[in-house]
Amino acid sequence: MKLAPEFYEVLRNRINISDVVRQKVVLTRKSGNYVGLCPFHQEKTPSFTVSDSKRFFYCFGCKAAGDVIKFTSNISGLSYNDSAIKLATDYGVEIPKLTQKQKEFYEESDEILNILELANKFFKSQLTPEILNYLNERNITNETIKEFSIGFAPRGNKFEKFFHDKNITNVQLGKAGLIGKREDGEIYSLFSNRITIPIRNIYNKIVGFGGRVIGQGLPKYLNSPETVVFQKSETLYGEHKAISSSYKKNYSILVEGYFDVISLHQAGFSEVVASLGTSVTENHLHKLWRAGDEIILCLDGDSAGIKASVRTINLALPLINSEKKISFIRLPTGLDPDDAVNKNGVDFFTKLIDTRISLSEMIWQIEYAGKNFKTAEDKANLEKNLKDYCSKISDSNLRASYYRFFKDQIWQNLVTKQQKTVAKNVNLLPLSSGYSELEILEHAFCALLIKFPQILQEFEIKEFILNLNFSNKLLEEFRNWYLSEVIDNAVEAGEIAAIVEKTSFFDIFLLLSEADNLFLDIAFNKDNVRLDLLWQWLYKRYYLLNLQQEYAHITKEYVITNIDDYEKVLFYKKEILKIASELQDLNESFINHIIDNSK
């Protein structure tokens, strides 16, 4: 009896896979799933897992995997179709009879599937040493070429002759999406002079092809047209291979191209699929979420990749919840996933996965990074855009979390910057004309020594001041002289003025010691100032400035060549955010201290 493919989905939805499995396996509940001894290989420790929510089984030992129908097929030895009939009978699920129209549709589908299998055999037979060499130069091994059934469609009429010899007509080839017709009526092979890559559905049936041009020519990549067996909005390249790994890891990685998938699978990342050069659809997302809770988008690091990310974000926001997640791998500009793993290695790509960013963080980076928010209108527009994203989230709890996240980001990145201006009259460094921020900080450290020499009693502070490398050499000489007098010669702070007057450092001493000098705010000169807060603020501001300068240096032109560079960039980003947050807390503490003591 022929079943409609849609009926398979009915069975998956109607029958709990755990109910079927436990007839053959003793299952134990664990973390929302079930575990037991695998029925397909000998083992002493349970490695066989079953998930009703994912409607899937997977063995970590022998890698057996599939849905409830596949399990029945593996246990009984029946075909997939016959296993579905058995399940329907056992569980009282009515099997709908096919209408005449449906019978004709599925007969046509079977015919097309058979033709596509024949086409793939032909394409594989046409691989030449030149084509194999081209693929090998792209780091695709002969084993991978065989695994993915990569072939070649030659020029000329060999393709048409192959099928005509089998009594397959041009009409049939056209329905299978293998030939086209020119304006003059001439029939031509759609993939002529292209490397062919078969596209398989979830059942491992070839439903179409992708073609990659050899040499120059446009389009570089070409997909089969949509047919009764191939709809781009439903199909993901590599899905038949990825589903087991996605279930095991609880995430899928979504890329753009065939060779991205092939290279990543070859490198061991078998949870990768591609969207066949078309926009991601809701069907794609739901299909991937059935295999794992998280979808990781890894798109090219160019403007087109960013635009594709924005489209996917807007599509996904109404669908996400605590169990359906989207995250992103940000590739350096000019790098695609294929390059990332072939040029930089497996460890580099693993690190990219481990350091992926959340959907909320991706939205923030898209809306904030590289833009100026000098006016109230700029900031209002940012807030409006972020609220628009949040409003699309259906899950109320998640929507509230996104609001809080964006509010925190605005506070950390915009409000605290405004506080630099507001707090100039309270506790921040004056923005003195003619001095860089680094020079202001260096002068502030020396001014602090003159005003509060007792800080040198703290060992860590004394060591920091002693080892500080000044950009201003005159200031460094003054530091050395001052510390020598205070520490080595035990000169009292009150006696320094008389001594320095006889040296070449008198002018700089006067500049640094005046109560309203350029380098310490008047708030610092109060008798009841909190020295601990003051020192921490200056030290962290100096540290942050050096972090920012080093980060700007290593990210120049956004070129990341190896995993060490990537880890270094990641460290600086995290450390900068951490210190900036600590400075914000110190700002507030200092302001509160000043206010309390002014009452």
Curated annotation (Swiss-Prot):
Zinc finger (CHC2-type) boundaries: 38-62
Pfam families hit by this protein: DNAG_N (PF08275), Toprim_2 (PF13155), Zn_ribbon_DnaG (PF01807)
UniProt-listed SMART domains: TOPRIM, ZnF_CHCC
Binding site for Mg(2+) 1: 256, 300
Cofactor field: Zn(2+); Mg(2+)
Residue span(s) of domain Toprim: 250-332
EC numbers for this chain: 2.7.7.101
Enzyme class: transferase
Cofactor, free-text remark: Binds 1 zinc ion per monomer. Binds two Mg(2+) per subunit.
An example Gene Ontology CC term for this record: cytoplasm
Binding of Mg(2+) 2, residues: 300, 302
Domain of life, per lineage: Bacteria
Example GO BP: DNA replication, synthesis of primer
Database matches in InterPro entries: DNA_primase_core_N_sf, DNA_primase_DnaG, DNA_primase_Znf_CHC2, DnaG_bac, DNAG_N, DnaG_primase, TOPRIM_DnaG_bac, TOPRIM_dom
Cited function: RNA polymerase that catalyzes the synthesis of short RNA molecules used as primers for DNA polymerase during DNA replication.
Domain notes: Contains an N-terminal zinc-binding domain, a central core domain that contains the primase activity, and a C-terminal DnaB-binding domain.
Protein name, UniProt field: DNA primase
